[in-house]
């Protein structure tokens, strides 16, 4: 009996340790009470093959509310073996389900998903505000565009056409558009849900399957929305969501031989690295990268309207916008007038709690981003830029920065050349059209530009000459689901939204049929 007891003791300890691991394992869903008082259930597991699961290595990370610096919840962290499992599920779903269903089935699922986003729009907007720090004003705008874009993608699903090609009477020749397969998608933290829709929408419409990595700082909305995919009728394995680091999940997706395409939105430096890694397996790559966009104000513009557009162009979403109009060029004859108007308008903007309905600018997304922005303030001052307003942290808790204007800058200053990704704008003066075009184009980036003038001939001329993928005239940060968006130069490759986005997710096959008896 004694020997039996001794022999059983190790097994008892193993059993006890197993129980401890089981009960200490982080949950796959948690109830969260939003700052507006509403409670919802937040998925916290990896979403693989239609289920929320713990990561194989049981690693987790905390998600922080940028507005109060407090922990929201803990989320499972994917590693390489989780990526492999998700890719295998996506590959199987592609081969056996999604690529072979009738296009109208994919269309209906995307329409359903758009409807579900609308149904849960207030919850999704609140999740974005809590997780990202953006104001509800911004978050609601994001969610509205998400549903519109998913519906647009649904409309394209049964309109992916090939061509019949005249190659003479001895052959019948045609081309068809086919999906690629498993698509790896890596989205940023500034527009989590919007970028989720920009990535999965065209991929699903064209018959591909997806393994998507949200940013570590903002994974919650993508996880919540993944369960809406199930409800919409999208089969298991078609959409997989893997919270985790870029160095692990992003790297593995970019290198994985069964991933046929990578779509990335983020920094130019990371985009370059992804291209290098993806080149080993010759993947199709689309990149939406950084920007340092010019916003030009001519003397004949409606100056009050121009000032509002300038502010919206740089301070919207706390300045965390890839196409933010961060370089302002004002014609010399109205320079001081516009600068004063901009100062007054900037100081009227309310900064603070994202759930305050009167707040325009919420928090920066992370402590890291907050200090990066404040470091650029110090750099600008040291280089001799004139601080007009802002230039400091707002409050003592939360990652808030006062909207900041620097004037009288020189074109070789770092604050003019480098992407800050925050609520900081530089202001310069110009005299002639040729002068401002030269300054506007003196950048490695080419994502967007703004032009403010009441002279339509001048507007068209300048829009042709400025090197940017999107040009806004007498408006800024004005998006539509059917208008392609993407950059020139080191701002990226490929286009998001509109018909142009679909080509990123298809490949062309040509078919020639020999005709024994010539067709007459």
UniProtKB/Swiss-Prot annotation:
Catalytic residues identified in the record: 288, 322
Cellular component, GO, one term: mitochondrial matrix
Subcellular location: Mitochondrion matrix
Pfam families attached to this UniProt entry: Aldedh
GO biological process: acetate biosynthetic process; ethanol catabolic process
EC number: 1.2.1.-, 1.2.1.4
Positions bound to NAD(+): 266-271
Involved pathway(s): Alcohol metabolism; ethanol degradation; acetate from ethanol: step 2/2
UniProt transit peptide range: 1-23
Physiological role: Minor mitochondrial aldehyde dehydrogenase isoform. Plays a role in regulation or biosynthesis of electron transport chain components. Involved in the biosynthesis of acetate during anaerobic growth on glucose.
Protein's name according to its UniProt entry: Aldehyde dehydrogenase 5, mitochondrial
Native source organism of the sequence: Saccharomyces cerevisiae (strain ATCC 204508 / S288c)
Designated gene of the protein: ALD5
